[in-house]
């Protein structure tokens, strides 16, 4: 039995009629950029995130970069980032001219450890950039308190956690700005790249609107040096359709995660993901830690089960960041995770039969 890591076609087929209708509506309108679909989605997504303002952008990386720019983070500043994350978190910091300062994760959710964050603050620190990794919220209350105590901006990377909750509130509602990705494989995925920033600050939202459109509010009048980071109308229309199903899809992910937890709890050589009692994960990924990860991945692959590694190389050891001079051993927790983590298939369209095949195959190979 073949089990893909994520079945994007199944997501489309479930909503085919509504998605096709939304696309035809845009195509028939003749308005393909920053029109009524974007305006409607911004209002709907802001409300979903329990926030006041939403600004759509071209990608999750755009969302991070423009959030930092709008907050005044730039050349000579430092931004605290996780040592264990996707490189986009670091790239956004670099793109605005600041320096990423990595901090190791805590042991339950592998998100930023607040105690280590406080130790990493220097006079040059301008912002803290936590990632809600694998769908699990970072400890926003602790990080917000640290940011307030030191006069720092707090920008959430919510690329993997749309719909997750932190102490009952949606992630994205407890910071200066929160950046979302609508990459197709995300819990709320477009038909291509897309992103958004949510914030309670109207001035910050307007600044990001300016930056995303060449620094212009009025055609050919450019107030600042902006960029092109616009979301097209087709993507906004599709996201509006999918947003109505997001909570149901996340609930299906949670059910599958619970099934994995129950069936795999006694398997030797693996450690199951944990959650804090104050967190409701969006279960974007179901990530094991494995004593013999590469062997187990090969065994699953041979049985038709597609797995992925999030992430095989710590960012500080990537050639892109060789200039930081952080040799192997600099961040042992991130380096250990890179050698142990394995992501199993999980998604709203994974059948129980497919999940049971994953479970049986994993047990046989452990």
Curated annotation (Swiss-Prot):
Q: Does the keyword Transport apply?
A: no
Location of the protein in the cell: Cell membrane
What CDD domains does this protein map onto? AHBA_syn
Locate the N6-(pyridoxal phosphate)lysine modifications and list their residues. 186
Q: Which GO terms describe its molecular function?
A: DNA binding; pyridoxal phosphate binding; transaminase activity
Q: Which family does it belong to?
A: Belongs to the DegT/DnrJ/EryC1 family.
Q: What is this protein called?
A: Erythromycin biosynthesis sensory transduction protein EryC1
Organism from which the protein derives: Saccharopolyspora erythraea (strain ATCC 11635 / DSM 40517 / JCM 4748 / NBRC 13426 / NCIMB 8594 / NRRL 2338)
Lineage at the top is: Bacteria, Bacillati, Actinomycetota, Actinomycetes, Pseudonocardiales
Q: What gene name does this entry carry?
A: eryC1
